[in-house]
Amino acid sequence: NNFELVVNSFRATHNVSIFITGSNSKLLSGELATHLSGRTVSLRVLPFNFMEFCQYKDISAPDYETLLAEYMTYGGLPLVCGADNKETKEVILNNIYDAVVLKDIVMRNKINSPLVLEKVLDYIVGNSSLTVSGNAIASTLSSNGHKVSAPVVYDYLRCIVDACVCDKVSRYDIRGKKALAFEEKYYVCDLGFLHLKKNRIKDEYNYIIETICYNELISRGYKVYVGKTWKGEIDFIAELNGKIVYIQAAYLLTDEKTIEREFGAYEKIADNYPKYVITLDKHTISRNGIIHYNLIDFLLRKVDL
């Protein structure tokens, strides 16, 4: 209690930099400015990206494909990365998800329906990278015996985003050049949570690759949108220091239909911003000015955007 008085006192009497961390159950980073009269800089601490994950493993001759498979399954939380076996990783992930994430959100926001919050959280994490509607979630949960209104679902989604479990990503109309306030996507901030709650039957790897690419862009400092075109969508519009790039992310280009889907998404986009397709294919097939990158090369920053 009253920690801000102590911090302000130190700052007034000592020439020091003060770093503050804490649980989301007590204080969100966005509220620090209020407590400390605005004299703060918020630094978002993310799970390891893939390059940091490999550095943490400190293997002299790393097999990047094996490391990526582990990263895609268990994510980049340091405590999980340091665990010796799969069973321990699973236990740690479950403990973080249940004891930290859920309890922090419930305590911080005084949630009076923790079970419904858990169902919303499970849904949003298990459907990372898919378009989400609060109305659809409310309808699904209500039909399964968990009656909840759409406004309550949207409030729970806000709490989940505030707790840094998922990011909400807006759509951007490329032709109209404006952000849209509907059909947002949510991306889970650590792949380990996706592993715990995955519920897809097909195309699972495509969604995992998309989530990895999103988190990599965020770790590099990009502002990210989902692109809306007349034909459909572009996975990501990413902006950093005034530079804009387009990115399509997929598992493998296994046939001509898949190639057309990923490269064809850029059809009729009139601007000249760089356009990329990122997949796990070892051999790349850039075409029509669209650059194809291998995912591991992209994550290890061997290629530039």
PLM features: residue spans?
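Interdomain motor-coupling "hinge/lid" segment immediately C-terminal to the ATP-binding subdomain
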Residues: 23-25, 29-131
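Catalytic cores of nucleic-acid endonucleases
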Residues: 227, 251-295
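Accessory nucleic acid-recognition modules appended to NTPase machines
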Residues: 86-244
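Switch/connector loops and helix/strand junctions flanking conserved nucleotide-binding motifs
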Residues: 27-31, 51-52, 256, 284-288, ...
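Conserved catalytic/switch belt of AAA+ P-loop NTPases
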Residues: 4-20, 33-34
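Conserved beta3 VAIK motif of the Hanks protein kinase fold
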Residues: 247
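SF2 helicase catalytic motif II
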Residues: 1
